[in-house]
């Protein structure tokens, strides 16, 4: 039977000093011997998705202590990608994922915690905590802060739904008046919570449900709704159940690596494709799988993407539906239920929401609104928005008159009535991206599924933005933004501003954009990221010249530079001949701190999850 990890610092006379310090934190005599549960919170006043999390750790702690544990909370950093977007701050976003993973590991291992609750929400925080949880492999439950309500405003006598991207597009569109732009800006992000569409934060919080590590509703229940309180309380109770199963009953199925198995990673990717999740999820799932020592690669993602239909279409791919609508339609469990009926997921995998070590099938039987007979579950998924601006969690208790169980015309569809039989994400490959690249097909206009255009090359996001706004980019161009990968950026910036500005200039469906950087979950259009190998690692994207023809064929999963192999060999030889100046941007002024240089030194390309190159660490 496994011994409590915390016994290392709480048992024996030689640990008198450690016990004295534990006592100074509030631990009582009769508490020693209880499991110590770490609560990794990520509260910050910088980020709307985290601004309401200050007291969430106390909620979870109360449930843990009531169930017989010792709860100890600490905090991680959290970067807001939207605020960091479009300037040097974005260089720090992806590297912050590794810092978060490391900080959770440091705190948990330094203090010998027995189990973990991760309170996350936004873009890099959930992935960083997920990497840490799988690295540590102690009982864990994830609970996020939840999505914000969709913005709403009246323009031209019509009520429209809004999100962050709408504010960005309006701000860059000269055809939108200053008054309308300001009105959209004021209305786009009305409450606390992660941005209201199927962007990276909400995508990742949904995927933790599919991985089996969070409770139903984690990805879709609004941050403002009173019902979300129960998710935090139940997370505390559930982690204690998992700890008891492992430490008292030697049940290894309570550990995250046995819950988030290869099958569960497949389930998560199937869900991702079906709901048209952010392309960043590919990066994070591959990274997390490596921490779990699971061989889950781009080849698996490519295989899955060819089999799974698009069952749930949400902003930014449509203005009609936001996360509040996904929740009304049954949330992640509603989508998984349809995927289960289509025979596309494994329902025999463990799940933290299952009682007594049960599986996903039992969870779906209770929480899929098309299966359940429980009126409390229907009530849970009827939780809706209040439309009142606030930074407070649990501030309202509004409900829809009914849930959306229309699988023919609703927010979530059955396989028969899918938005498309092609899924929402695809892996492309060809001489531009020998190791693959990612496109969010859910956001691509049908007329652009095949595209041939002339390369317009930029060696930084800043230059690309200037070129787009300055009129250099014209209809039919393929905008190439390179040296923005994990190593070359460094930090693999998101390219939301270039894609947004293409839309604002009426070029959103008339141009393509490819990059070794990545895209915000708010991106739509023919935007292809994660090109691997990246330019700084000798990728072909570094050899593209202005005017080269690039052919993109999403149905055939192909991206090809129409230049002869002989010419490419000549260009590669010339690049190699530059020595230390080769495979670097020709003209780019960018300050790179020592912290970012340290990240770049070990960073792998996107197809490996942009994680540290372990071969350099393991000799």
Curated annotation (Swiss-Prot):
Mg(2+) binds at residues 81, 123-124, 494. One of its GO terms (molecular function) is dihydroxy-acid dehydratase activity. One of its GO terms (biological process) is L-valine biosynthetic process. Binds 1 [2Fe-2S] cluster per subunit. This cluster acts as a Lewis acid cofactor. GO terms for cellular component: cytosol. It catalyses: (2R)-2,3-dihydroxy-3-methylbutanoate = 3-methyl-2-oxobutanoate + H2O; (2R,3R)-2,3-dihydroxy-3-methylpentanoate = (S)-3-methyl-2-oxopentanoate + H2O. It is an enzyme of class 4 (lyase). It comes from the Bacteria. Belongs to the IlvD/Edd family. This is Dihydroxy-acid dehydratase. It comes from Shewanella frigidimarina (strain NCIMB 400).
């Amino acid at each position: 039977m496994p011994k409590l990890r915390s016994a290392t610092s709480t048992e024996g006379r030689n640990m008198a000093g450690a016990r004295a310090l534990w006592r100074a934190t509030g631990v009582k005599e009769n508490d020693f011997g209880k499991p110590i549960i770490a609560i990794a919170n990520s509260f910050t006043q910088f980020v709307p998705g985290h601004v309401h999390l200050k007291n969430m750790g106390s909620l979870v702690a109360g449930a843990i202590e009531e169930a017989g544990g010792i709860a100890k909370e600490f905090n991680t950093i959290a970067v807001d990608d939207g605020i960091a977007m479009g300037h040097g701050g974005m260089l720090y976003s992806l590297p912050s994922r590794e810092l978060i993973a490391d900080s959770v590991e440091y705190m948990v291992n330094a203090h010998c915690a027995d189990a973990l609750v991760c309170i996350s929400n936004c873009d890099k925080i959930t992935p960083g905590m997920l990497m840490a949880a799988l690295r540590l492999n102690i009982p864990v439950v994830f609970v996020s802060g939840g999505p914000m309500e969709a913005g709403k405003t009246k323009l031209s006598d019509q009520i429209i739904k809004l999100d962050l991207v709408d504010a960005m597009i309006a701000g860059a569109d000269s055809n939108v008046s200053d008054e309308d732009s300001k009105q959209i800006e004021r209305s786009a992000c009305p409450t606390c919570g992660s941005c209201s569409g199927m962007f990276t934060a909400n995508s990742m919080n949904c995927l933790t449900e599919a991985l089996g590590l969070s409770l139903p509703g984690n990805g879709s229940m609004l941050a403002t709704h009173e019902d979300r309180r129960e998710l935090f309380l139940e997370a505390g109770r559930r982690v204690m159940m998992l700890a008891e199963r492992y430490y008292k009953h030697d049940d290894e199925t309570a550990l995250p690596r046995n819950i988030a198995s290869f099958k569960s990673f497949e389930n998560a990717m199937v869900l991702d494709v079906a709901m048209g999740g952010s392309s960043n999820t590919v990066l994070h799932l591959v990274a997390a799988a490596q921490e779990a020592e699971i061989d889950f690669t781009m080849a698996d993602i490519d295989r899955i993407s060819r089999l799974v239909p698009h069952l749930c279409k949400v902003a930014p791919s449509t203005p009609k539906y936001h996360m509040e609508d996904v929740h009304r339609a049954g949330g992640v469990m509603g989508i998984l239920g349809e995927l289960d009926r289509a025979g596309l997921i494994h329902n025999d995998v463990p799940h933290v929401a299952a009682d007594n070590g049960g599986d996903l099938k039992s969870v779906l039987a209770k929480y899929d609104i098309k299966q359940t007979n429980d009126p409390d579950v229907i009530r849970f998924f009827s939780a809706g928005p209040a439309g009142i601006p606030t930074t407070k969690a649990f501030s309202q208790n509004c409900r829809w008159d009914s849930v959306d169980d229309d699988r023919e015309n609703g927010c979530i569809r059955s396989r028969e009535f899918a938005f498309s039989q092609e899924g929402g994400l695809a892996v492309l490959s060809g001489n531009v991206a020998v190791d693959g690249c990612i496109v969010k097909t859910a956001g691509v206009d049908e007329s652009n599924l095949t595209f041939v255009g002339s390369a317009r090359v930029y060696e930084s996001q800043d230059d690309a933005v200037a070129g787009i706004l300055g009129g250099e980019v014209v209809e039919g161009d393929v905008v190439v933004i390179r040296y923005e990968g994990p190593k070359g950026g460094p930090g693999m910036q998101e390219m939301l501003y270039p894609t947004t500005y293409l839309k604002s200039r009426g070029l959103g469906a008339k141009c393509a954009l490819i990059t070794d950087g990545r895209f915000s979950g708010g991106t739509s259009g023919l935007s292809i990221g994660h090109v691997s190998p990246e330019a700084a690692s000798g990728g072909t994207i570094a050899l593209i010249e202005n005017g080269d023809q690039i052919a993109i064929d999403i149905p055939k999963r192909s991206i090809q530079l129409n230049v002869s192999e002989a010419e490419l060999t000549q260009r590669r030889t010339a690049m190699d001949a530059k020595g230390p100046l080769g495979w670097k941007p020709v003209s780019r002024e960018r300050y790179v701190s020592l912290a970012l240089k340290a990240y770049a030194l070990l960073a792998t390309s996107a197809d490996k999850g942009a994680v540290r190159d372990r071969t350099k660490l393991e000799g």
